[in-house]
């Protein structure tokens, strides 16, 4: 069965995650089952949308979809099981949290999480499958909001502007302040900063 045929099936969930690359904060996944009777215009990969457009689409997706759910893995879980496994687990949690059980899941990327229904990985799915685009949008909006909250809890790193990604501002703050509780110690720049802080203490 090809992608066009899958897209025509009822009860197909689109699944995507955001936040694999950042040095801080959770990885967040979403699963969305769109309602064919309530189409949403402008769905595309969240990275290609402005923040304001993502926010507007987030509202529409939540209002018009048959079901949506979010799942995440914390920095501690990421450090324990690695970022790839944490991304898959976050996606699994999102699908399992759906109020409607999908007949099939279409997952962005080249790997599928462990699911109790048929699942297919779709390369560049966030640009090709509307339900995956919708999942990428609500996952991105939710994660950005979490990072704004973490910025208030852990000031000085600029988490609310770079969302935890390894920008020069973030790396400089890590060097100066050391890691916060929301940083991922398994990521090399964070680990090096933690080791330098340990050396400085002694």
From Swiss-Prot:
Q: Tell whether Nuclease is among the UniProt keywords.
A: yes
Whether Signal counts among this entry's keywords is: no
* Alphabetized GO MF terms: manganese ion binding; RNA binding; RNA-DNA hybrid ribonuclease activity
Residue sites binding a divalent metal cation per the record: 16-17, 108
- Catalysed transformations (reactions): Endonucleolytic cleavage to 5'-phosphomonoester
Q: Which UniProt keywords apply?
A: Cytoplasm, Endonuclease, Hydrolase, Manganese, Metal-binding, Nuclease
Name the Enzyme Commission number(s) assigned to this protein.
3.1.26.4
Show which residues constitute the signal peptide. Answer: none
- HAMAP family associated with the record: RNase_HII_B (MF_00052_B)
Q: What does this protein do?
A: Endonuclease that specifically degrades the RNA of RNA-DNA hybrids.
**What name does this protein carry?**
Ribonuclease HII
Supply the gene name.
rnhB
């Amino acid at each position: 069965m090809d992608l066009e045929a899958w897209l025509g099936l009822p009860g197909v969930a689109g699944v995507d995650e955001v936040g694999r690359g950042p040095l801080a904060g959770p990885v967040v996944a979403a699963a969305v089952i769109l309602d064919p009777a309530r189409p949403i215009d402008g769905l595309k990969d969240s990275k290609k949308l402005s923040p304001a457009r993502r926010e507007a689409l987030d509202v529409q997706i939540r209002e018009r979809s048959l079901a949506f759910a979010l799942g995440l893995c914390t920095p501690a879980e990421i450090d324990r099981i690695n970022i790839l496994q944490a991304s898959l687990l976050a996606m699994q949690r999102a699908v399992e949290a759906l109020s409607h059980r999908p007949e099939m899941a279409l997952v962005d990327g080249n790997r599928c999480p462990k699911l109790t229904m048929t699942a297919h990985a779709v390369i560049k799915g966030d640009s090709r499958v509307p339900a995956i685009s919708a999942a990428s949008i609500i996952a991105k909006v939710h994660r950005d909001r979490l990072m704004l909250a973490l910025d208030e809890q852990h000031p000085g790193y600029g988490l609310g502007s770079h969302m935890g990604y390894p920008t020069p501002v973030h790396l400089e703050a890590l060097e100066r302040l050391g890691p916060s509780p929301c940083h991922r110690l398994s990521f090399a720049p964070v680990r090096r900063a933690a080791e330098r802080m340990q050396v400085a203490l002694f």
